[in-house]
């Protein structure tokens, strides 16, 4: 059984409202879904006989500030039985909440915390959704494209006081232009 069979079978079996877009490549299959059907789709991928996804490799976030739903959350899955990789993607904005998949894949707990900490995408029913990489009092989400390059506060060790101090940064941020074109491709200006 190969990626092509899994792709074709999934297309014929899955409810059409669960999948917005499907794409097949030599590296695996990609399914774009609405946040409302994310949990059901991942449950299908894990439990169905012809997909049998046992491993959630990781969850990543991507920020596209020009989109209405600016955040894309990507679930990379692996079916060991069928030697197949499956990528499930969903989009969210600042207020959209995504269903936690910790009950399906216990390892998702760490990655959902990371996506929350770095991007601010909230997972509903997560057992312990708190910051994982930044400090307790940290404000903002540092992998968002609108996060200031220098941050909001400077944290340093003050030798005379013998403690770590946080001070607000008082320099203004320069304008940032997001050019998504590859710097290695030649652009024609005209």
From Swiss-Prot:
InterPro entries per UniProt: NADH_DH_suC, NADH_quin_OxRdtase_su_C/D-like, NADH_UbQ_OxRdtase_30kDa_su, NADH_UbQ_OxRdtase_CS
UniProt-annotated location(s): Mitochondrion inner membrane
Single annotated GO MF: NADH dehydrogenase (ubiquinone) activity
Lipid bilayer topology: Peripheral membrane protein
Chemical reaction(s) catalysed: a ubiquinone + NADH + 5 H(+)(in) = a ubiquinol + NAD(+) + 4 H(+)(out)
Enzyme Commission code(s) on record: 7.1.1.2
Top EC class for this record: translocase
Domain of life: Eukaryota
Cellular component, GO annotation: mitochondrial inner membrane; respiratory chain complex I
Keywords, sorted A to Z: Electron transport, Membrane, Mitochondrion, Mitochondrion inner membrane, NAD, Oxidoreductase, Respiratory chain, Translocase, Transport, Ubiquinone
Similarity comment text for this entry: Belongs to the complex I 30 kDa subunit family.
Role played: Core subunit of the mitochondrial membrane respiratory chain NADH dehydrogenase (Complex I) that is believed to belong to the minimal assembly required for catalysis. Complex I functions in the transfer of electrons from NADH to the respiratory chain. The immediate electron acceptor for the enzyme is believed to be ubiquinone.
Quaternary organization: Complex I is composed of about 45 different subunits. This is a component of the iron-sulfur (IP) fragment of the enzyme.
PANTHER family, per database record: NADH DEHYDROGENASE [UBIQUINONE] IRON-SULFUR PROTEIN 3, MITOCHONDRIAL, NADH DEHYDROGENASE UBIQUINONE IRON-SULFUR PROTEIN 3
Protein name: NADH dehydrogenase [ubiquinone] iron-sulfur protein 3
Native source species: Solanum tuberosum (Potato)
């Amino acid at each position: 059984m190969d990626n092509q069979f899994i792709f074709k079978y999934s297309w014929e079996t899955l409810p059409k409202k669960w999948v917005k877009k499907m794409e097949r490549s030599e590296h695996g299959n990609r399914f774009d879904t609405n946040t409302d059907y994310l949990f059901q789709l991942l449950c299908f991928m894990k439990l169905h006989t012809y997909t049998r996804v046992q491993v959630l490799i990781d969850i990543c976030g991507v920020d596209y500030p020009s989109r209405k739903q600016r955040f894309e959350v990507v679930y990379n899955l692996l079916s060991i039985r069928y030697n197949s990789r499956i990528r499930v993607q969903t989009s969210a904005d600042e207020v959209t909440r995504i269903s936690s998949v910790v009950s399906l894949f216990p390892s998702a707990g760490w990655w959902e915390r990371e996506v929350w900490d770095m991007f601010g995408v909230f997972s509903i029913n997560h057992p312990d959704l708190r910051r994982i990489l930044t400090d307790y009092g940290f404000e903002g989400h540092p992998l968002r494209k609108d996060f200031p390059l220098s941050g909001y506060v400077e944290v340093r060790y003050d030798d005379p006081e013998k403690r770590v101090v946080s001070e607000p940064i008082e320099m203004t941020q320069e304008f940032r232009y997001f050019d998504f074109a590859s710097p290695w491709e030649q652009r024609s200006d005209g």
